[in-house]
Amino acid sequence: MSTERKGKIGVAHIYSSFNDTIVHITDITGAETLARYSGGMFVDADRLEGSPYAALKAAMAAAKEAQRKGITHLIVKVRAPGGIKSRIPGPGATAAIRGLSRSQLTLIRVEDVTPIPHDGCRRPHGRRGRRV
């Protein structure tokens, strides 16, 4: 049984926060950008930029453009803000993955690449923390 795939492989970098979702498709090396869309390009109100609907539209537009450029398979890398910010991807992450899988592109693997600090930067709000 052969594991070789016919067609070109691309990498879909999905950055999803609670304010916006960015779908960026590159070649396998990451050097050449094939398509880049954000949720804010498809909705009018600023508060809707991070919504699942905007992420779905952005992912489908990026997938269509990548297909035009010859991509047939995708490796998906999902990223949340990370660091001292949220380690949970926003609501648009799953919708963006759904939008990519709805297109004719084959998803090879989905992985989480959120940056996790190993005792790097100190969190804000001082020694006693945030007093509410």
UniProtKB/Swiss-Prot annotation:
Annotated signal sequence range: none
Pfam family, one: Ribosomal_S11
Gene Ontology cellular component terms for the protein in this record: cytosolic small ribosomal subunit
Keyword rRNA-binding set for record: yes
GO MF annotation: an example: rRNA binding
InterPro entries recorded: Ribosomal_uS11, Ribosomal_uS11_sf
Keywords assigned: Ribonucleoprotein, Ribosomal protein, RNA-binding, rRNA-binding
Transmembrane regions listed in the UniProt entry: none
Gene3D superfamilies: Ribosomal protein S11
An example Gene Ontology biological process: translation
Function summary: Located on the platform of the 30S subunit.
Oligomeric form and interacting partners: Part of the 30S ribosomal subunit.
Family of this protein: Belongs to the universal ribosomal protein uS11 family.
Name the record gives this protein: Small ribosomal subunit protein uS11
Gene: rps11
